[in-house]
Amino acid sequence: MSLASRRKVRIRLYGTNPADVEQVAREIVDLAKKMGVQVRGPIPLPTRRLIVTVRRAPSGQGYHTFDHWEMRISKRLIDIEASERVLRRLMTIRVPDTVKIELQLI
């Protein structure tokens, strides 16, 4: 294959369910290895914690009680040196609704 037909692709996966993110990352790496392309990853990135504190009593009267809500966002990074054929196969992977994917050509 010529160098022009191969490109480096950076895949960012993120989602609120860490098991789903890990499963999709594993499927991408398995597919890339099966097709014989060079792959780096999945590289775990720091988990982001979003915390929202809300007051329980809407009127402002009574005790000062608060609820704390938290959402964790797990992230993985995968680098693949892939051809157009591999990228087309990547598009066939079933991705749960809780996982978002960003593709970036480097």
UniProtKB/Swiss-Prot annotation:
Gene Ontology BP annotations: translation
Keywords: Ribonucleoprotein, Ribosomal protein
MF (Gene Ontology): structural constituent of ribosome; tRNA binding
The keyword Ribonucleoprotein belongs to this UniProt entry's keyword annotation: yes
Keyword Transmembrane: no
GO CC annotation terms, alphabetical: cytosolic small ribosomal subunit
NCBIfam families per record: uS10_euk_arch
Family: Belongs to the universal ribosomal protein uS10 family.
Function: Involved in the binding of tRNA to the ribosomes.
Assembly notes: Part of the 30S ribosomal subunit.
UniProt protein name: Small ribosomal subunit protein uS10
UniProt organism field: Pyrobaculum aerophilum (strain ATCC 51768 / DSM 7523 / JCM 9630 / CIP 104966 / NBRC 100827 / IM2)
Gene that this sequence comes from: rps10
